[in-house]
Amino acid sequence: MIDLYTWATPNGRKVSIILEELGLDYNVHEINIAKGEQHTPEFLTVSPNNKIPSIVDSDGPGGPGGKPLSMFETGAILIYLAEKTESELYPKDFKKRMATLQWLMWQMGGVGPMFGQAHHFMFNPSEVVPYAQERYHKEAKRLYKVMNTQMQDNCYLAGDDYTVADIATFPWVDRFRRHQVDLTEFPNVKRWHEELWERPAVKKGMEVPFYNQ
């Protein structure tokens, strides 16, 4: 059994999506970051960086009978869960795996931080900072363009197969309105976004942590 410590953010929903895709049993523990619950001593024991999401796998890395394993950082969690279950969401073929890793790191190092800043400065900001709004809006649109170009000849980010790179990126792109982005400008991204929304695991994962209330 996996315990998922999460909240309704793009990062949190990456992990609930992959758990649904893999059909793994999991318990949801809501960590209300608006109330600062990520800073409690209890949460610190499972996430040393005081960030959601994190998981505790009571079956451990070797399957049933192993020691409980705590993990934080979404990229690491996605790879761990895919490898634990021997899923092709993180391909076994070396070239495909490296392509997946490359685009996963692109999300972790670019999309997440830049879209996060776009959210902060453009979506109901407590203070309007025009320079920051222009900078992060411009960078967000650049990243959408990168995605659009990549998927001109590919069904998904890392090629023709759905992978952890798509799972990691989707919840951020789903907030495109907060970036003041019109997806019709990026038709390949729009097609990809609509297609992923049709996946049952994505629909269910995007409702966590509230769907089970």
Which residue stretches match the model-derived regions?
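GST-like fold's C-terminal all-alpha helical module
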Residues: 81, 107-200
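Conserved beta-strand edge residues that scaffold enzyme active sites
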Residues: 33-34, 165, 210-211
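GST-like domain detector, emphasizing the conserved glutathione-binding G-site
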Residues: 1-134
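Terminal-tail/helix-coil boundary detector
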Residues: 202-213
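Phosphate-coordinating loops and pocket residues in cytosolic domains that bind phosphorylated ligands
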Residues: 45, 91, 169, 198, ...
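A local structural micro-motif
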Residues: 27, 90, 159, 184, ...
